[in-house]
Amino acid sequence: MVKITVSESNSKNLNVAYIYNSMTRYLSICGADADITFDDSRTNLVMTAENRFHSYLRKFTEERVAESVSIGYKYALFQKNIRPSGLSETDREVLLCALVSADFDEDKRYVAERLKDIRVYSIDGFFNFRLQALKEKWAGIIDCIPCCFTERDLKDFLDYILSEREPSSVHFKDGELYDADYVRLKRAALIDGGLDDFSIVREVLLSGATEVECLTNPPPVLCDVLKKYFGSRTAFRFS
């Protein structure tokens, strides 16, 4: 049997919850067991499977750990340090999520590559001691954000990001967001703090999609953001 362990400080244990919830499909395929345990300072996810599934489970575990760093840790750093004047709290959230998603794929690949020789995935320790270049890159982004950022600037920034991406779409239905294969997206679960009712907007922005199809009526906060920043890239397909 092979054992794969993911560990995180209790203050960031939403990362472990995200990884577990995102891995249930693969765990089921392998017939693997998974347990979440807690002690005074840490939350641990322990997955056990037959040896033949080792590389399979490691691959998806490393992808999910990389996502937790490239979204959760990055957002926390940006939320703390990026506070330009000129934006409402809603628009600031849009800016933060847009910055996180702008080079998400690149960040995720970088993190995943450095996880290859890790035996126990201690996320906070790995971030603090093995990702110095990535932290310096993120600090450089923070330094580039002007002290004043207008709604027009934000619109131009979103237009630029969306125009540079390969076309892709997501689908909103009954309060949830789905990718092109109708797999439910849950990346916003990696974000702690911020506006309480903003989760579905974060999900759209973090998806990296260039188009949004609404199959049911979206909540007002999402509707406003889509009309303001996605415009014709949004399709409302409900009566």
Which role fits each region the language model picked out?
Residues 1-198, 202-204:
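Conserved mixed alpha/beta catalytic, RNA-binding, or beta-rich assembly cores of soluble enzyme
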Residues 181-239:
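C-terminal structured domains
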